[in-house]
Amino acid sequence: SAMESLIGQDLAPAGRGPMRVELTGDPLCEGLRYEEPVFGMVATSYGLEGEYPERLAGPEAERVLGRFADGVPALTLRDMGSWVSVYNGSPGLPPGILRNLARLAGAHIYSDTDDALYAGRGVIALHARTAGPKAIQLPRQLRVRELLDGDGRERTTDRIEFDASAFETRVFEVDVP
C-alpha cells in the first residue's frame, strides 16, 4: 500500500477493536506527566475510547512503543538506516512522545512542557496549557523582544524565562543580534 511505501513498515488490517493505546514503557515514552486526563491522554495511554470497525496494526517492529488494548502493535518505530520510521495507529499522540521523537531525530527542542509553541519567521509564541514557570530554549543567542505585554526593550539571550497564567499567550520577536 501507499502507506507502507511511505513509512517502510508492513501494516496489516487489525479488524474491529479498541483504539486506546497502552504505552510499553519504552524510554521514548518517558516524561509524560498528566495529573489528570487531557484530551484522553494519561501518563500510560492515549487515543480514542471504544471500538472502531477498522484499524491498521503496525508490525512487530524493532521497537513497539504502544499496543492497542488487545495486544496489537499500535505505535512502532523502525530504524531505516539514514532515517527512523514511526507508525501511530490512533489519534492523539501525546506531545511528550512527539517531543522525544523530535529529539531522537536531532531537532531543536524549544520547550519541555506540553504548551503549544509556535516558532518561525522571526516570531516565537507560547500558549500556556497550565499556569507556572515557562522556559523557551533558543537554538543560539538571539535578540529577543516581547511583543504584547513587554516593555519594548530588547535583550540578547539563548533562553526566555517567564511565569504564565493558564491559557495565557506570550509572543516574542527574535532576530540574530
Residue ranges, per PLM feature:
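A conserved amphipathic helix/loop scaffold
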Residues: S1-P177
